[in-house]
Amino acid sequence: MWGRTARRRCPRELRRGREALLVLLALLALAGLGSVLRAQRGAGAGAAEPGPPRTPRPGRREPVMPRPPVPANALGARGEAVRLQLQGEELRLQEESVRLHQINIYLSDRISLHRRLPERWNPLCKEKKYDYDNLPRTSVIIAFYNEAWSTLLRTVYSVLETSPDILLEEVILVDDYSDREHLKERLANELSGLPKVRLIRANKREGLVRARLLGASAARGDVLTFLDCHCECHEGWLEPLLQRIHEEESAVVCPVIDVIDWNTFEYLGNSGEPQIGGFDWRLVFTWHTVPERERIRMQSPVDVIRSPTMAGGLFAVSKKYFEYLGSYDTGMEVWGGENLEFSFRIWQCGGVLETHPCSHVGHVFPKQAPYSRNKALANSVRAAEVWMDEFKELYYHRNPRARLEPFGDVTERKQLRDKLQCKDFKWFLETVYPELHVPEDRPGFFGMLQNKGLTDYCFDYNPPDENQIVGHQVILYLCHGMGQNQFFEYTSQKEIRYNTHQPEGCIAVEAGMDTLIMHLCEETAPENQKFILQEDGSLFHEQSKKCVQAARKESSDSFVPLLRDCTNSDHQKWFFKERML
């Protein structure tokens, strides 16, 4: 009986249901139109400018946008180097673009925004399988200030054309108060036609840290993925980052950063073992090979690699965990130093910082920083004051100006450290970064190494390439008291260490020579690196049985330290001075 009645009434009820559904859909459409109009009226400085609404579609494991075909003979179509043979006005325009952006934008404008990069990952990465339906969705946040059109748009298209639709919640561009005309209405119009893209404009210049926080506060994704504004994403870059955060929410994961040449736009990525981040005692970020202890821990060449620090421009983090950790230090200005501060905080407060070898993103490293980093010193001081405990003195010894730098109030950041019950910096050095040599800095045995006879002259070492510190001669130069290239340490192993940089250098005397040359320090000091700083100030080289003397360089007005037979001359007397009086 129940069944027959139900069958007879079904068509009528179905019609009524359909009519009600149509009315409901119409009301929802009107409400949606009203909200869109309100959003458009309210858009302005500081407001988000939304792209078109997402529409469901089949095959959501495919990228958000298909990559349009690029002719194989197009400039740089597969990431190869391009060298234009220019003359006259064209050459002038190219040089002007480099002067303005520190990147060859003249060339960038002639390379497709949709070019395909060559594969630069370990072949084992292709075999990885992902549970797309259960991975978290991400908001990709790209902050920019006066960025060139082609590098910015190539970054956006690269994200959309390589990110699975099901995993990408949105792309948020944060305009940090740019004043270039192409980044105003023209950019808004371009982005309005792209799916899942939003534009947020700051009301004033915020700097990288606070601009990224504007994007983070507006983000709807479970994971925040930060990218710089001149990047290109490799196929399969996103899944490994999200998979790792799905496995471990307290993991902050970086892609392998592949170099894109600023002048030729050649993609220089490689599929070999990536490097990890470190720092030197000036609090400057450095790259290092993966230590043997980490290789032993890894079970596969495509496992995540633990890294003491990160470069800072490109990483993914759970939004909840980012907020739990205290996001960024908003007392930091513009950019510089925030990457080390965040790295210390991740490790010391219970997280883990990793690089995933299956995630590759190309990055254009400018010829030099296009904007001032005059706030970077204060940012580094904030990091040292909050996280480094007594080891901050090693930083101040090598950078005396930092002691005098105003750095603002760090009370809240220290309270955050207490609240999260974070570990001390000694734990970080012993557990996370045992490869970093911790200087002794014994009183009276570090600083400027000054000569008594040649008044106001100090040991000085300034290699032409900061990335290749060995093999050059130590000279004498007027003492400046700023640390850096005039900072040396005399150790209990009888070494004279140049340890403002990584890797550290030790002064050596090569066979048959009388000059002082910089070599790499070794675990046990070899004989040609051993000196005795005697009570009278003589600097005695044990192997040669000679003393270091301040001498005039042949056919020159400059001075150098040379080995000579020992005498009682003041030109053979040396003393350390921590800072200028």
From Swiss-Prot:
PROSITE patterns: RICIN_B_LECTIN (PS50231). This is Polypeptide N-acetylgalactosaminyltransferase 12. It catalyses: L-seryl-[protein] + UDP-N-acetyl-alpha-D-galactosamine = a 3-O-[N-acetyl-alpha-D-galactosaminyl]-L-seryl-[protein] + UDP + H(+); L-threonyl-[protein] + UDP-N-acetyl-alpha-D-galactosamine = a 3-O-[N-acetyl-alpha-D-galactosaminyl]-L-threonyl-[protein] + UDP + H(+). Mn(2+) binds at D228, H230, H363. Residues 43-67 are annotated as: Disordered. It is linked to Colorectal cancer 1: A complex disease characterized by malignant lesions arising from the inner wall of the large intestine (the colon) and the rectum. Genetic alterations are often associated with progression from premalignant lesion (adenoma) to invasive adenocarcinoma. Risk factors for cancer of the colon and rectum include colon polyps, long-standing ulcerative colitis, and genetic family history. InterPro entries: GalNAc-T, Glyco_trans_2-like, Nucleotide-diphossugar_trans, Ricin_B-like_lectins, Ricin_B_lectin. Its EC number is 2.4.1.41. SMART domains: RICIN. It comes from Homo sapiens. The chain crosses the membrane at residues 20-37. GO terms for molecular function: carbohydrate binding; metal ion binding; polypeptide N-acetylgalactosaminyltransferase activity. The keyword Transferase applies. Residues 38-581 are lumenal. PANTHER family: N-ACETYLGALACTOSAMINYLTRANSFERASE, POLYPEPTIDE N-ACETYLGALACTOSAMINYLTRANSFERASE 12. Pathway: Protein modification; protein glycosylation. GO terms for cellular component: Golgi apparatus; Golgi membrane.
